[in-house]
A protein has these predicted regions:
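Membrane-interface helix-loop junction between the first two transmembrane segments
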Residues: 33-49, 75-81, 217
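Membrane helical hairpin/interfacial module
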Residues: 50-117, 131, 135
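Alpha-helical transmembrane segments of multi-pass membrane proteins
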Residues: 20-41, 104-110, 173-180
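Class II aminoacyl-tRNA synthetase catalytic cores and aaRS-like
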Residues: 8-20, 30-39, 80-88
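Peri-membrane helix termini and adjoining interfacial loops of integral membrane proteins
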Residues: 38-43, 114-118, 258-266
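Short, structured segments at the rim of ligand-binding sites
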Residues: 126-130
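Perimembrane loop-to-helix junctions flanking transmembrane segments
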Residues: 41-53, 122, 268-271
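Long, contiguous internal "core" modules enriched in hydrophobic/ aromatic residues
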Residues: 4-10, 21-26, 81-83, 121, ...
């Protein structure tokens, strides 16, 4: 299957409007960073009960979505779905962008910028989060190599092998990210090995959703039709991923209900948690 890639010219008013919008979002983000650094992490919702605040919600979402954004590239090279090959480079590029965004948000935890050097030179190998640093950097390296084999014609015959390594590594990355929460034995809301497969299932759905939004925007802005058949295939895949995520959520809560020590937490999150219960049923389950 011969694929001809054409770059977007980036000369239309809409393109510059998009750049301006993204620049505005970046400025708002920098303003939020300054506000948090000035007033402390308490403004993000963190306290003795809530171990991570709102920035961490976005960071974990971006990291998990980065793994799922590689879905299309994996289907093209690992599973032999040739119809997805023209869309594979965007998949890899978006995966890198999402991971970089998530890790940038996590940098806020370090406080002063110079503490990054300490984090890079001193590792606590008993910490699952420290081990995840290697998973994140490895994922970046594998995806860059994967993109190179796709974009360089003389390296195309290595694409299936590079895709396989990237696929295995993304599974390890999402498992490690879920284990950050699953190994928090002091927190009843987490403390479950089921969080690892749950994160994998959710990453497939989140990543594909973000990828589709970017793909549809790019194709619409550049006048390139996607086709109803391709969109229908993506819709079926998304339905399967959502069903898998819902399955693991149900199993997770049923497992907690089996153990008496988790009953208070389950009563809180499922019935008596106020806004948290509403967010769970309407946000996570219904939506």
């Amino acid at each position: 299957m011969k694929i001809t890639l054409r770059e977007l010219q980036g000369t239309s008013p809409g393109y510059y409007l998009l750049l301006a919008g993204l620049a505005l979002i970046a400025l708002l983000g920098l303003g939020a960073v300054w506000f948090m650094e000035h007033h402390g992490h308490i403004v993000t919702g963190m306290n003795n009960q809530i171990v991570w605040g709102l920035p961490h919600v976005f960071a974990v979402f971006l990291v998990v979505a980065a793994s799922g954004a590689l879905n299309v590239a994996s289907m093209a090279s690992v599973f032999g779905k040739t119809e997805f090959k023209p869309l594979a480079p965007l998949s890899g590029l978006l995966a890198i962008a999402l991971l970089l965004g998530g890790l940038t948000v996590l940098m806020l935890d370090l406080g002063r910028p110079d503490r990054l050097i300490v984090a890079m030179t001193h590792f606590n190998f008993k910490s699952i989060f420290a081990l995840n640093i290697f998973l994140y950097s490895g994922f970046m390296g594998f995806v860059v190599a994967y993109l190179w084999t796709m974009m360089e014609r003389r390296m195309n015959h290595y694409t299936p092998l590079a895709g396989l390594f990237a696929f295995i590594w993304r599974m390890a990355l999402t498992t490690g990210t879920g284990s950050i929460f699953g190994f928090l034995v002091a927190r009843q809301a987490y403390d479950s090995a089921l969080l690892a497969p749950l994160f994998i299932a959710l990453s497939l759905s989140y990543g594909l959703a973000v990828y589709l939004l970017v793909l549809m925007l790019a194709c619409h802005a550049s006048g390139r039709p996607l086709g109803d058949a391709l969109l229908a295939r993506f819709a079926r895949l998304q339905a399967i991923f959502i069903a898998a995520g819902l399955y693991f959520v149900i199993v997770y809560h049923l497992t907690n209900l089996y153990f008496t020590k988790h009953h208070d937490f389950e009563r809180f999150i499922l019935l008596e948690g106020g806004v948290h219960t509403t967010l769970f049923w309407l946000g996570q389950v219904a939506l």
